[in-house]
């Protein structure tokens, strides 16, 4: 076999006159009678190869038979393309290689789709033939970026004294939150391991063990319904540190992210990042992961309108609800249908209606304007900085409904109005989360992040008096409206950890059975510690400018958690189940 001397995509005019050996795939073959042109592709790019009977007749004969995706080894001489035939769309467009020798290393069937960017092919087909899909340049660029980002993370953390330590993949099931993937133990019949949803407990134990600075780029597993863009197995950048406070972690993580963006995609990220409280995020943006690339802030006007004659506002305000609004600048031209569509849109998030004021130079147009005195109307318009040409939208409801409805309306309007700038990376931290929230279905408190998150020191007394007012030492990093990382300072005292377990409804026996080893470890000199975990797939997706994490994972699952290429999951042999002492009890529908 002819061994490669150069990659296809690296040839330039300075290589003219050199003899080279290339290995790659046939992207396209064109027969121009006396000459055959082959675009040869490898992971670095494409170069044009010319087969001429005058240079080598045998090579020319071989080229007559090659087809798309044949694997070739070619020896030839680099020449400048004749003037006027250069291809400015290729980095190699000033040169071509005249072949003097060729070997067909393998033939190929006609692929089910073209191996090129921008193809309109059903994703199921792409996933079924993932080995072909991954040949496309945009997919290879995404995986190269993933590699560069992972390397940058490792380089940065190594320089700052972190050790990469692996934690177990086969661990204990603690059914809190999402479902575990269970693995039966053949050697311990009737018992199961769980695949980790996160190395959370192990990384805290490593801090107890005195490792001080740990990290891992680690696979995690969650057996959950794959709503939106989720995967049953995903990758985290997992980090934990001892003898630090919240500021230490947040500032170091800003440095790390800035370093990764610079190294992987050449983008300068400004630090420090903006910080806002959870309360401010929910009030102004209707979400705890706001996109700050555009304005459209939400304003609470409850106090202004609680006593107006408009009964909807009055009733909601006096029942403990809120009235919030946002100003859609320059949208006074929206049609009746537009307004009806937006009302239906907020209805998807629980809102019972969408009130509006259309501001024109002459008047305020609105079915609700007649219920307001002139000074009340003026105060309301001023509160939202309204001007002629704007529409002011209002939702009156419970705080959580108003936040969700207007938060989603804000994003919807920004997309529709083209307010979201492309190629901009807007980072922020959301801090001061509540430690707990109340689950009305389960009738108990649940941890907003996880039960190992430490409360603010000054809020410790409130754990007994009013748990919902306790703030957490938690912090989420948000990029362009996507949460890319979440972390906290951890509880490191047994008494506080036991109190936390009790608050979320774990009995003393349950806490001991599930986390007894951890509680015991806390009695042997546990340092103050904290950490963070970044969703690596989502981070790379945003860096690559892609719409789905499936585009930055080599072998992703579908939304029904299947691998179309290998056919997983699959039915296993009875012998295997017998060895594991497992009987399968399928739902009736699946047995038929």
From Swiss-Prot:
What GO molecular function annotations does the UniProt record carry, in alphabetical order? aspartate-tRNA ligase activity; aspartate-tRNA(Asn) ligase activity; ATP binding; catalytic activity, acting on a protein; nucleic acid binding; transferase activity
Q: Name one GO biological process term.
A: aspartyl-tRNA aminoacylation
Where in this protein does the record put region Aspartate?
Answer: 200-203
Disulfide partners: none
| Protein residues bound to ATP | 222-224, 231, 483, 535-538
Coiled-coil intervals: none
Q: Which UniProt keywords apply?
A: Aminoacyl-tRNA synthetase, ATP-binding, Cytoplasm, Ligase, Nucleotide-binding, Protein biosynthesis
Residue sites binding L-aspartate per the record: 176, 222, 449, 490
| Residues the UniProt record annotates as site (Important for tRNA non-discrimination) | 32, 84
- EC class of this enzyme? ligase
Q: Which reaction does it catalyse?
A: tRNA(Asx) + L-aspartate + ATP = L-aspartyl-tRNA(Asx) + AMP + diphosphate
* GO CC, one annotated term: cytoplasm
**Source domain of life:** Bacteria
- Pfam families recorded for this chain? GAD, tRNA-synt_2, tRNA_anti-codon
Q: What is its EC number?
A: 6.1.1.23
Q: Where in the cell is it found?
A: Cytoplasm
Q: What does this protein do?
A: Aspartyl-tRNA synthetase with relaxed tRNA specificity since it is able to aspartylate not only its cognate tRNA(Asp) but also tRNA(Asn). Reaction proceeds in two steps: L-aspartate is first activated by ATP to form Asp-AMP and then transferred to the acceptor end of tRNA(Asp/Asn).
Matching NCBIfam families: aspS_bact, PRK00476.1
Its family remark reads:
Belongs to the class-II aminoacyl-tRNA synthetase family. Type 1 subfamily.
Tell me the subunit arrangement: Homodimer.
Q: What is this protein called?
A: Aspartate--tRNA(Asp/Asn) ligase
What is the species of this protein?
Answer: Carboxydothermus hydrogenoformans (strain ATCC BAA-161 / DSM 6008 / Z-2901)
């Amino acid at each position: 076999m002819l061994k490669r001397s150069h990659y296809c995509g690296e040839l330039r005019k300075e290589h003219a006159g050199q003899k080279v050996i290339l290995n790659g795939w046939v992207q396209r073959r064109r027969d121009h009678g006396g000459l055959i042109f082959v675009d040869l592709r490898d992971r670095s790019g494409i170069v044009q190869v010319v087969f001429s009977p005058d240079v080598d007749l045998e090579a020319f004969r071989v080229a007559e038979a090659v087809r798309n995706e044949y694997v070739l080894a070619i020896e030839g001489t680099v020449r400048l393309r004749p003037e006027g035939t250069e291809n400015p769309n290729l980095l190699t467009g000033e040169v071509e290689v005249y072949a003097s020798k060729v070997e067909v290393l393998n033939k190929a069937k006609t692929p089910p789709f073209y191996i090129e960017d921008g193809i309109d092919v059903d994703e199921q087909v792409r996933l079924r033939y993932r080995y072909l899909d991954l040949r496309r340049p945009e997919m290879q660029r995404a995986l190269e970026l993933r590699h560069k980002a992972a390397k940058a993370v490792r380089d940065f953390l190594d320089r700052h004294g972190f050790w990469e330590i692996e934690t177990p993949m086969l661990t204990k099931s603690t059914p809190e939150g999402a479902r575990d993937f269970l693995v039966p133990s053949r050697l311990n019949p009737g018992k199961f391991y769980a695949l980790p949803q996160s190395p959370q407990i192990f990384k805290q134990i490593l801090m107890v063990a005195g490792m001080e600075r740990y990290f891992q780029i680690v696979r995690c597993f969650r057996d959950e319904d794959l709503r939106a863009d989720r995967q049953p197995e995903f990758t985290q950048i997992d980090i934990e540190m001892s003898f630090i406070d919240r500021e230490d972690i947040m500032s170091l993580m800003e440095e790390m992210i800035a370093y990764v963006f610079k190294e992987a995609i050449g983008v300068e990220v400004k630090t420090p990042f903006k910080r806002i409280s959870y309360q401010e995020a929910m009030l102004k943006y209707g979400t705890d992961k706001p996109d700050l690339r555009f304005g459209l802030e939400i304003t609470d006007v409850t106090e202004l309108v609680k006593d107006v004659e408009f009964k909807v506002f009055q009733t909601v305000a006096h029942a403990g609800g809120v009235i919030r609004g946002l100003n859609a600048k320059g949208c006074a031209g929206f049609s009746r249908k537009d307004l009806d569509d937006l009302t239906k849109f907020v209805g998807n998030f629980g809102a019972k209606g969408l009130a509006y004021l259309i501001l024109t130079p002459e008047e305020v147009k609105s079915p609700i304007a007649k219920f307001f005195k002139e000074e009340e109307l003026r105060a309301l318009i001023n509160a939202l900085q309204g001007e002629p040409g704007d529409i002011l939208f209002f939702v009156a409801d419970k705080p959580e409904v108003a936040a969700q409805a207007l938060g989603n309306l804000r994003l919807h309007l920004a997309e529709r109005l083209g307010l979201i700038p492309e190629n901009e990376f807007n980072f922020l931290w959301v801090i001061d989360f509540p430690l707990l929230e109340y689950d009305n279905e389960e009738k108990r408190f649940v941890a907003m992040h996880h039960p190992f998150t430490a409360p603010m020191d000054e809020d410790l007394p409130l754990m007994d008096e009013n748990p919902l007012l306790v703030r957490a030492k938690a912090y989420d990093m948000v990029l362009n409206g996507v949460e890319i990382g979440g972390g906290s300072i951890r509880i490191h005292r047994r008494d506080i950890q036991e109190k936390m377990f009790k608050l979320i409804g774990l009995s003393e026996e349950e806490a001991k059975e599930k986390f007894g080893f951890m509680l015991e470890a806390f009695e042997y000199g546990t340092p103050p510690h904290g950490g963070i975990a970044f969703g690596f797939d989502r981070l790379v997706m945003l860096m690559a400018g892609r719409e789905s994490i499936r585009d930055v994972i080599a072998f992703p699952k579908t939304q029904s958690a299947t691998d179309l290429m290998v056919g997983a999951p699959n039915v296993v042999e009875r012998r295997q189940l017998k060895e594991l002492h497992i009987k399968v009890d399928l739902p009736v529908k699946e047995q038929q």
